[in-house]
């Protein structure tokens, strides 16, 4: 696979950078980055900016280590009650926001109560109320136990009760994160400087400058030395690793790709008037045959140039994954046998047919993403030998949304929160936004999902989450309902200045800014 960058694109990239109002050089004090799309919604944690990624300008109450254990820069103690419906939090003394004003229990209570009322992207789950008992102590009440509430504590950035204004905060945030905003020029750049009041570990970079460039322009700028950190597509990494004066980083990620199948027969519509169901994928034999026919290792090697690992669940590499979920894929003969046994016979056109219905499917994916396009084309080629014809269609998410309930659809997910399993498979989540678009429903699986949520702690929930895949009789995986064909986890790849050390952190998630999860550990290694 080759990537060509024209002289014109490189010139445009360099011209754009030259036009910016700050020096472009990377030093021990300043680091210039192009790691993702512009956060067009601004920087309000109530809205859940940047696809759930690390809150650069804010601090949540908890953070995750590389091994997914929890620690806190802001709390000296945090404990759920035995029944799991109350959390007692104790703040460390003398915490401050980035403007030097005190951060107290009043701010924590305000943040949580306001996030629950605002209807933003932050899923507050069973949250009921937060009360400031005094300056250092907060009591959070839940409507019911929720093992995943620890992830809420680890994602919602704290804002000031006295200075929060929902009309202006997204563009003029005051937080308690590792950096504070200097300036934001929409469409061009975001400049932040180190927060002198940050309660966590400070890295070596006093200033970060984020520029918003497309992949081609960012790659060209990295080669010219004008950017210190650039996120690049995995397919580009094979070329980039041989470039002089840059360092290639490959980061473990839980960002995945998978195909969701419509699980019910056609004939219904949702409240938006979109079709639900597909008579072909409603047959479990079709779903299992596709799962067996796909060679995940081949996809990882040929489409992602090896910068991906095969995945058989949507939570590969996480504690709640079921390690026995893997199976021998790329097995064309087994896939054919499954279809034969289910009555799907080859017709004169070489397409499987059953009761007058041909196995012709349309796979939808979002346009503008070369990786999804290449994956879709490869998937079509891999299922053709078993007699399934797969056409490809792409469009914006608004377009895909109209067809994802009635056609197999290529999705990307990946979170460190096991709540994602609930969103994929709970009948209560069916058709809610992009959750459970296939309208999967299995009462036995639902019981495991609810038991996982009801567990007092996330550790006690793990066996219940694992049972969602397969409990010996039921499950969402290949042994059970084969609700998805999960494909791979995509590793995140970056080019940096040779002097930049990106440190270590928890596995990166789906989202372009997730590299910042490890920002506290970044270093400048040159004198």
Where are these regions (language model features)?
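A structural "hinge/loop" feature
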Residues: 36-52, 73-76, 101, 149-156, ...
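Aromatic- and charge-enriched surface segment that lines or borders ligand/interaction sites
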Residues: 77-119, 133, 139, 221, ...
């Amino acid at each position: 696979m080759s990537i060509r960058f024209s002289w014109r694109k490189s010139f445009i990239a360099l011209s754009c950078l030259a036009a910016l109002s700050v020096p472009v050089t990377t030093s021990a004090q300043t680091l210039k980055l192009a790691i993702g799309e512009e956060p067009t919604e601004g920087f309000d944690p109530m809205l859940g900016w940047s696809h759930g990624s690390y809150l650069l300008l804010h601090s949540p109450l908890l953070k995750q280590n590389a091994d997914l254990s929890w620690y806190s820069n802001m709390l000296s103690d945090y404990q759920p009650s035995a029944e799991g419906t109350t959390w007692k939090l104790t703040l460390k003394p003398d915490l401050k926001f980035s403007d030097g004003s005190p951060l107290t229990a009043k701010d924590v209570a305000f943040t949580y109560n306001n996030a629950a009322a605002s209807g933003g992207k932050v899923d507050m789950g069973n949250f009921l109320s937060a009360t400031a008992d005094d300056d250092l102590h907060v009591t959070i009440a839940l409507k019911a136990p929720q093992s995943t509430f620890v992830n809420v504590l680890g994602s919602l950035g704290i804002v000031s009760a006295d200075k929060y204004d929902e009309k202006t905060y997204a563009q003029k945030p005051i937080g308690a994160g590792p950096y504070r905003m200097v300036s934001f020029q929409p469409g061009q750049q975001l400049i932040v400087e180190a927060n002198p009041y940050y309660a966590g570990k400070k890295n070596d970079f006093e200033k970060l400058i984020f520029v918003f460039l497309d992949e081609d322009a960012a790659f060209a700028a990295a080669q010219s030395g004008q950017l210190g950190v650039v996120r690049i597509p995995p397919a580009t990494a094979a070329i980039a690793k041989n470039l002089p004066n840059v360092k290639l980083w490959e980061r473990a990620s839980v960002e995945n790709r998978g195909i969701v199948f419509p699980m019910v027969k056609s004939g219904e519509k949702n409240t938006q008037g979109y079709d639900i169901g597909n008579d072909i994928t409603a047959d479990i034999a079709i779903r299992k045959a596709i799962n067996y026919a796909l060679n995940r290792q081949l996809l990882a090697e040929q489409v992602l140039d090896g910068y991906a690992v095969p995945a058989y669940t949507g939570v590969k590499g996480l504690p709640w994954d079921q390690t026995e979920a893997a199976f021998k894929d790329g097995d064309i003969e087994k896939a054919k046998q499954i279809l034969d046994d289910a009555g799907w016979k080859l017709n004169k056109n070489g397409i499987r047919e059953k009761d007058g219905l041909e196995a012709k499917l349309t796979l939808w994916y979002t346009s503008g993403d070369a990786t999804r396009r290449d994956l879709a084309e490869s998937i079509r080629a891999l299922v053709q030998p078993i007699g399934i014809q797969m056409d490809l269609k792409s469009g914006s998410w608004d377009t895909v949304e109209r067809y994802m309930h009635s056609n197999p659809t290529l999705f990307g997910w990946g979170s460190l929160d096991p709540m994602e399993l609930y969103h994929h498979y709970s009948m209560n989540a069916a058709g809610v936004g992009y959750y459970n678009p296939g309208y999967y429903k299995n009462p036995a699986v639902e019981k495991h999902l609810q038991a996982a949520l009801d567990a007092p702690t996330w550790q006690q929930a793990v066996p219940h989450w694992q049972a969602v895949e397969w409990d010996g009789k039921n499950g969402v995986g290949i042994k059970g309902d084969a609700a998805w064909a999960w494909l791979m986890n995509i590793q995140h790849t970056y080019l940096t200045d040779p002097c930049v050390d990106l440190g270590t952190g928890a596995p990166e998630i789906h989202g372009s800014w997730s590299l910042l999860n490890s920002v506290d550990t970044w270093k400048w290694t040159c004198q």
